[in-house]
Amino acid sequence: DVVQAQAAARQGADIIAVIRTTGQSLLDYVPYGATTEGFGGTFATQENFRIMRAALDEVGEELGRYIRLCNYCSGLCMPEIAIMGAFEGLDVMLNDALYGILFRDINMQRTLVDQYFSRIINGFAGVIINTGEDNYLTTADAYEEAHTVLASDLINEQLAFMAGLKEEQMGLGHAFEMDPSLKNGFLYELAQAIMTREIFPNATLKYMPPTKFMTGNIFRGHVQDALFNMIGVWSHQGIQLL
């Protein structure tokens, strides 16, 4: 992870997101210490946070700019991971209870209480939260269900305000996930992105790239990514994932 993160920073990355190991959201405790293995990702532990923060500070000195670090406080240990991130200097945290409710069958009352407490911590620590609206579009049609993304953004904004987060700390999520074969699809994507920016003018919006309709056609994939990048710049998205 350290080697890849430093390489990405040298290629121009501003934020490094370290993917969590599969299933950590269902652990009712936080693992301790540095870990040497994971499944599709790396365990979120305080020591792992410290190691990556030190690595990014090292490459940041070399490049003359600060590299932000992102991890995940979702699942059954949202406040615990939030406080670890605050201690170790993380800048961005995925922090959304609705994903756990919809996709992990986590108890709704418990996880919304956890989300509130973890957002208080993130707000106090100056951490930008990201929300997971893009996940809805992996199982729902991005054109037919576009309104659900906006509804979730509005809910997440109000829950964030209740926890004391500033607008600039709200990385409200949406995604470039419409079917490329949809007539006028690019215009719909552009309209959706501009609308989201206008409704949340001060938020650090999180804009996710196309994944659902990526095929083995490499050329078409590059075109989809280029159109995503064009809309992201055009509509002034805040955090654009690659």
Q: What does each model-found stretch correspond to?
A:
Residues D1-L242:
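Anaerobic metallocofactor- and corrinoid-dependent redox/one-carbon enzyme cores
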